[in-house]
């Protein structure tokens, strides 16, 4: 006897949620990028901010979902729509590599490499801090 899955566990629905989230995330990123354009001679603050906000929100979301229970039903739908879709479309590591590469190709190789490494390291550190903070808060709530 096959297990009956809920509406939100159906693959086409999940793919659609990723697509919708991705469209919305890309739209939000585009609005921010146009409002805060990168300059060739300075730090691309818009891209850096987008990626750090994305790392913060994704780490928070995933850690909260881990504490909420198994990855199925609404939790899976939220993870895929917001985590994979929206934040996948919102963050822009392709712009990060293009901006770093442009600096390297223009002779500012140290600046380009430093920007790339700093961005990735800052995102990873931010995610680690957020995960630790959520675990601390969630641990206190379950006590």
Curated annotation (Swiss-Prot):
Na(+) binds at residues 88, 91. The chain crosses the membrane at residues 13-33, 42-62, 80-100, 111-131. It is a multi-pass membrane protein. The keyword Ion transport applies. Na(+) is not transported, but it plays an essential structural role and its presence is essential for fluoride channel function. Its main location: membrane. One of its GO terms (cellular component) is plasma membrane. Keywords: Cell membrane, Ion channel, Ion transport, Membrane, Metal-binding, Sodium, Transmembrane, Transmembrane helix, Transport. It comes from the Bacteria. It catalyses: fluoride(in) = fluoride(out). Fluoride-specific ion channel. Important for reducing fluoride concentration in the cell, thus reducing its toxicity. This is Fluoride-specific ion channel FluC 1. The lineage of its organism: Bacteria, Bacillati, Actinomycetota, Actinomycetes, Propionibacteriales.
